[in-house]
Amino acid sequence: MYLIFDTETTGLPKRWDAPITDSDNWPRCIQIAWQLHDEMGQLIEHQDYLVKPEGFNIPYDAERIHGISTELAEADGITLAEVLEKFNIALSKTKFIVGQNLGFDVNIMGAEFHRMGVESQMSSMPVLDTCTEVTASLLQLPGGRGGKFKLPTLTELHSYLFDQPFAEAHNATADVEATTRCFLELVRREVFTKEELDVPKEYFREFQERNAEPFKLIGLKHINLKAASDKIREQLKALAGEGQQTVVSEEDKADFKAAKFAHLHNHTQFSVLQSTIGVGNIVAASAKNGMPAVAMTDTGNMMGAFHFVSAVMNHNKAASGKNKALVEAGEEPTETEVKPIVGCEFNICENHLDKSKKDNGYQVVLMAKNKAGYHNLAKMASIAYTDGFYYVPRIDRKIVEQYKGDIMVLSGNLYGEIPSKILNIGENQAEEALIWWKEQFGEDFYLEVMRHNQEDENRVNKTLIEFSQKHNVKLIATNNTYYLNKEDANAHDILLCVKDGEKQATPIGRGRGYRYGLPNQEYYFKSQDEMKKLFADLPEAIINIQEIIDKVEGYSLYRDVLLPKFEIPDEFMVPEDEEDGGVRGENKYLRHLTMEGAKRRYGEITESIQERLDFELMTISNSGYPGYFLIVQDFIAEARNMDVSVGPGRGSAAGSAVAYCLGITNIDPIKYDLLFERFLNPDRVSMPDIDIDFDDEGRGRVMDYVINKYGQKQVAQIITYGKMATKSAIRDTARVLDLPLFEADRIAKLIPGMMPSKWNLARFISESEEEVKKALRSDEFDNVKELIAIANEDDLAGETIQQAKILEGSMRNTGIHACGVIITPSDITNYVPVTTAKDSDLYVTQFDNSVAESAGLLKMDFLGLKTLTLIKDTVKLVKYRTGIELNPDTFPIDDEETYALFQRGETVGIFQYESPGMQKYMKDLKPTVFGDLIAMNALYRPGPLEYIPSFVRRKMVTRKSNTI
């Protein structure tokens, strides 16, 4: 006997390898059908049952597939206990259980038997499956795993065996009928072996005699489950009096009319390769639309938080100034000031530490009410990367509970916990989730409703509104924006293709042969009028937005730089420092180290030297950063103790006599008349910045020393943001749109090698020809003119340029600053959010170098220089071969043979003098004194580069150069 069966369920399991005893993992059975056939293929029994959903709902996504609604199953189904009893009787009559990909159905029914505590022999019965490597080899469909043939679907197998299509009905009775036909035909064709069927050899001959023709469907009439669900739902609506138009009170109408809309769920370019919106653009758009606030809620990170708050503050300062001038002139103010709301769309999973299985979690929006809330967001955003990263940055409910202070929550988009459970698991589970969030956040928890004209969204919104009324949770209207204007939708879709390495021609959908994409073009930054029109029947969703705005306190993320505590000897400590946080003791100790160093450097300290040192020490004291110098001299001294080569000094720090006396630099600024004011200006006190060169092999050891001294959680590297440059935007767009490679390359080469300041692709296209011509050299202008002509063509090349101009500047990836290192007084996550590096255990700040100091971070530049390693290795080799011990610090700077090398341009391996351009100018200049090398180093950079020929000519005619 053969029992062929199939089930329809509430969805898919989280883990396919979970045991049937894991009841929470396996979905529920809501329909089962079976056919019992004898060994010759004759039908003995056919049964089909809907199962009453007891204690659960059938989620919408499951209903959309098979058509069985909760209402239909409750009306026409029988209890699970009855179903299991009948199924057990059928199992007792058969030798084999049969199905298409039967393992899933066996687990579903096994889990149901376990839930009900019913014994069954099913799990020990032999299985015959129509979806195996054998049937895959029969059909030989490409695309399987590991280069094998693809496992066939029921439709594919049916079409192969009978040369006629079968549309998988996702109705258990229809699927069982088709599976039975395929199975019996496979038996007739002897695809199953006698060993598998446990039959004698003559069985197949007898089976084929009884069934000489290919098997046919038995002709069952299948119920249209979707139509049946729709019918019963309409009947229930009629009984409940639903379908009547929503009545909005006059009071709500008045409040709605006066209410201001603000976007509270927005993604910027810091949602890497997911949004085309720049931070400045979203602030400008909010102000332009008269919105009182705007939130930034990027996916999984807070990289843009500082830039966002700063952009809003700068806008508000300008708007306030303009409004003040208008009021003073007797006119009405015209500018809108905007309140920034910092948030993050977190991925909240079951256990953020569990990396044994993929669990990207649910997307839920958390927003800060104030500075304390911001720091809690930063903590969570940091943990999401440092502890929870697995495919995506993740946190879990325990982390939310720990850092929930001063936080507001929006329930999120369709991937949020509550909406997702409504669609995929069931309304009961969604309601349980809502209760948890409300228990944690009370009146700071809001249900988020979106209207993008999507069927699944409409279904979710209906349930959310019911939940809102039942649990007294307020609704908030959002639009989950990813691009600024509706016409940017195509460019955004191209960006998603760039992220996933897809062609835009690939259809949007799930599974093999499809790609990810938004379902329509409604995810743009809509105006107040557009949003109010969408929610005219649900005015409270707009009115409630002001409540969130009012809860947010204004705050700045700017702060003074915080230095880690540097331990100074007891004799230099000043008691008052403990009381008021002063740095008197550090100043005393710095003066002591400086004067001791001055004795070693100068021997006799003349009045002019003392005067210079006093001036510098006073300026350093006034800056409030003596600790900075103590920290730097400490790790440089340790580097030398570890035999790590340290550079003699680079940049403006070489102008400091204090730095020279401390051993930070090896250049005497007094001897070379270098200006201290370029390093620290007493009239404009700012954080000093010292670039320190180490040999590239020893840099890591110095880093380890700093980490051990200050603590691993107090040291971090600095993130960099990789932007999509003009040529990159063109090439990426061309690949997605399938523009031929040679054509894309030709267009990209029309872009100037070095873009003029404040120019980009969009400006080239929009500006007048005269303005473009002013910004470019003649040859560059000709190329750009051709580029503009192509952009204005109505073809694929023109479309590529037009879309690329929108994508240009989008963040493409993140990296790590080559030399920047942050040191903080305590755990760095107390100050800024962090992420992690792929090849290092060190934290990486989510804020980049452009805002690190403004955010209060002490930044050091630890540069690894290969040149220092070469010098160090050369010194060792000379000693090894000749016994002569060289000291590079004592090499003369007037050696004629060395200048001869420079004059011939033989400077490969000499830092900052080895480029082909520099070698050419060395040959022209023919340097003879150290001052020539200094001058050329200063000239060889953008700006003064054009004056090099003039400088060379003046030297050649021995005329005194003017100061440049």
Which positions does each model-derived feature cover?
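Metal-dependent phosphoesterase core characteristic of DEDDh/y 3'-5' exonuclease domains
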Residues: R15, W26-T70, N88-N211
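Structural motif
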Residues: Y2, K95-I97, A262, A293
